[in-house]
């Protein structure tokens, strides 16, 4: 589990693409502390497992499903990526519950500056927007942000200067694609309140005859 508080901005060092998967090598420093092979690191909000460690970074596998559902396929060598290690049991919960399982991709439709804040308008599919609520939490490229407004085709967030400086948002432009993960709490609530499908009766005449009735 993650919190959406980015620890470091890393750089894509290499991308080895296969037919249905890829291996990312990321140049990093802070997230290497106490990290072992097999640990999880969120890369632009996507939970990846460390397969190799180097003095200046790490390598991780990216599977077919992740490439299809996320914006990782658009990364190139030199791309800046937000990094966060999995939250330790004794760590501070600074953001919100982030699983690292991206729901889909959004597109930056507009960027505007307002005093010290920068506003981002993100367009997304209706399947994602159904879980986006005003004043609720959403993860954009691994960054925990608060939804300021929701529209039929997207939503807006406001970012403070600290967030801009500590993440890769300052390198984002209109038209860029970003990874989106909605608040998992809403998904669980929806699942719990959905009526269950009626169970089929498996008792048949043949079964009764076999049992001696």
Where are these regions (language model features)?
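Conserved loop->alpha-helix
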Residues: 1-213
């Amino acid at each position: 589990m993650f919190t959406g508080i980015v620890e470091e901005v890393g750089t894509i060092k290499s991308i080895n693409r296969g037919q249905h998967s890829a291996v990312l090598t990321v140049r990093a420093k802070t997230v290497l502390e106490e990290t072992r092979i097999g640990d999880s690191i969120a890369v632009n909000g996507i939970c990846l497992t460390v397969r190799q460690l180097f003095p200046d970074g790490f390598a991780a596998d990216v599977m077919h499903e992740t490439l299809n559902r996320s914006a990782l396929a658009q990364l190139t060598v030199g791309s800046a990526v937000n990094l966060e290690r999995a939250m330790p049991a004794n760590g501070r919960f600074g953001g919100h519950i982030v699983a690292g399982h991206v729901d889909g991709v959004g597109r930056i439709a507009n960027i505007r500056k307002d005093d010290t804040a920068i506003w981002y308008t993100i367009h997304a599919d209706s399947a994602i927007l159904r879980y986006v609520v005003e004043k609720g939490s959403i993860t954009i490229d691994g960054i925990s942000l608060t939804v300021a407004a929701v529209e039929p085709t997207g939503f807006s967030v406001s970012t403070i200067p600290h967030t801009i400086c500590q993440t890769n948002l300052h390198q984002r432009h209109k038209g860029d694609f970003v990874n989106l993960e909605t608040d998992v709490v809403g998904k669980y609530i929806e699942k719990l309140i959905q009526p269950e499908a009626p169970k089929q009766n498996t008792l048949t005449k043949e079964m009764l005859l076999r049992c001696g009735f």
